[in-house]
A protein has these predicted regions:
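A short, charged helix-loop
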Residues: 1-7
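NAD(P)-dependent aldehyde/semialdehyde dehydrogenase
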Residues: 9, 15-157
Length: 157
């Protein structure tokens, strides 16, 4: 809730890089209750040229139509949607968000849901969390799903 403009811009990159389809793309954010979601839209705005891609635009139009026909509440800026949703996965051109009131309860939820989460980005210097803008830049030892792929392959030989 106290991110700088630069941190929000880096978060926006984590959201839209690879059209949001990267295995480590940010598909959901947790924000403090009362958070101004327009700050997220502001950080995303430089990526409005995504609509120049026919495939992205088709996904945006399709998902928006599905949401509107289903009478879901959503926030929309003309090229990207924010939807309050408990799911960790979101479709192209959409970011799920969830409000929280207690940071300790949020950490507990993230720990409990660890198997559903590929990676966590945050402005906190917390073990296992990546800085905003670094989700798609893992280190050699940042194995997918925390599983050491090389050790697994060695077992097979």
């Amino acid at each position: 809730g106290n991110e700088t403009k630069e941190q929000l811009e880096a978060l926006a990159l984590d959201i839209v890089q690879y059209f949001g389809l990267g295995c480590r793309s940010t598909s959901k954010i947790f924000v403090p209750k009362g958070y101004d979601l327009n700050l997220i839209f502001g950080a995303l705005y430089p990526y409005n040229s995504l609509m120049d891609s026919a495939k992205y635009a088709n996904n945006y139009d399709y998902n928006k139509a599905v949401y509107l026909m289903s009478l879901f509440d959503l926030l929309d800026n003309g090229f990207f949607m924010l939807k309050e949703d408990a799911s960790y996965t979101s479709p192209v051109a959409c970011l799920h968000y969830e409000f929280y009131e207690d940071a300790q309860m949020l950490e507990k939820k993230l720990t409990e849901d660890n198997d559903l989460i590929q990676c966590i980005t945050s402005n906190q210097n917390t073990t296992g969390h990546f800085a905003f803008g670094k989700a798609q830049q893992p280190q050699l030892w940042d194995y997918a799903d925390g599983k050491n792929t090389l050790a697994f392959l060695n077992i097979l030989t």
